[in-house]
Amino acid sequence: MTNPNDRHTPRAIKQTMPLAHEVVEALAIDNGVCIRPVGLRRMDLKTGISDIINAPCGATLEAKCPPCAKRNRALRKAQCREGWHLTTEPAITPDEPNDYQRHLVEWRADAQALRDELESAGLPTDDYDQAIAELDIEINAAGVRGNVLGRTASKRSRSTRRRQDAPDLPKRAMTATTLGRTYESPDGRSYRPSMFITLTLDSYGRVNNGVPVDPATYDYVKAARDALHFSKLIDRFVQNLRRVAGYDVQYFATVEMQKRLAPHLHMAMRGSMSRADIRAVVAATYHQVWWPSCDTIRFEGGHLPVWDEKAGYLDPATGEILPTWDEALDELDADPDAQPLHVVRFGPQIDAQGILSGTPDADQAIRYLSKYLTKSLGQAADSQAARDHAARLADVLRYEPCTPTCPNWLRYGVQPKNAKPGMIPGRCRGKAHRPEHLGYGGRRVLVSRKWSNKTLSEHKADRRTWVLEALGVADEPANAGRYVWSPVKAGDPDLPPIRVRLLRSIRERLRWRAHMNQLQAAANGLDLSATTGRAA
């Protein structure tokens, strides 16, 4: 073997040799070890012993940490598979409140009454406000979800009358079930098929291999706004789907980008509907964005609104106070001829397939659903034309408001909601404005509450329990009061270098794998060699 430290070794040959730290990372990836572990200090209050634990970073993207992304993808696949073809109703029945919980709420009622009396008399209520806040914390700590007052802020609403250009949806009686219809075959067997649905957005212009044929006529503004509000459109589609299906439809969905850089939806739906009904639901689904107009630019370049501590943002030339977010919406509500800023709809391309449990089609659909979960939405383009297309879309997205709190509203003469000093149009830190998201600020994976009757943490715990049982290791019961966890700062003398921690984790993983192989061989009646780990 050529020695890289040999001075006589040609430079060209040295450059072909792998770097040592790259070999460590490659070995860690091959063995499923997180390459960006987070150091946490664990203090055992029972024994007084303190040690450092390497916690996985939990990244979901392969570009950041392939092992963690792979584990997350496997976890999502298990979640999808477990809930898609359930045959029994998920039992989600809240427990009856116990005596202690009732007692706390009674105290809360007394405190609220006394506080209201003081407020009516014009007396200060600070002491009771603090007591009520502490009672609310105690009520939640006792195992009660939510807040006793519910929503306290008023919610702005508009007319719910449907648009004239949208077809009406059929009304069907709702059934208290999350399971779809059961079909009987002539031989007496029962089938309860489910569906795999793919929906896309509308066209913005002709494309060839994902690139606009004529960028000048391609509607980048519509593409950007559709991406920004795509998550709201999905919510509306689910509402309409349940209304037409006649039962509480459960779903597992993922969002990914098409080659033209427009988001589209893949949805595993429990139960089945006719394709005609699904097409009707898609045609009738839309989302209106009732925001102030942002088609006219008022401030740009060096001419930007200035901040005043008392009034908020002002016009730098005239000193005029810009309308606040609520004032802009009030003006919009008062205009009887007002039109929504944007209306987002699905496109005409719809794919709906019937899927039976335990078939190759079901396995293939689950693989397809999770195929791109480890990839960034803004995956690197493979050609210069595609990179130019992505750059043009990013330029439009840069100044499109993504939320009511987006600094880009200043560009159009409106103060963002909860305005604060330092806001600059074009520098929003929102998720939708990041290059890797291409305008879509929602979640990549959408799972209904009654899909598998388990949270993602519970699915993770199931996998952990299986591994511990296979290793023959007893699961230590959770003891919330025994350990105190704290992050370890970079440069802490107790924190070993990252390469040392990776080497230790690799060794530990190899030991676990050898133990697993021995247990599997013993179960199959084989004898593993102590040196090679292969069957003798």
Please identify what each model-predicted range represents.
Residues 69-71, 111-259:
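Signature for HUH/AEP ssDNA processing cores
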Residues 73-76, 205-209, 276-278, 378:
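Short helix/loop capping segments that flank catalytic or ligand/cofactor-binding pockets
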Residues 221-224, 308, 345, 356:
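N-terminal ectodomain recognition module in secreted, GPI-anchored, and membrane glycoproteins
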Residues 233-245, 281-294, 373:
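Hydrophobic, Leu/Ile/Phe/Ala-enriched alpha-helical segments that form helix-helix packing faces
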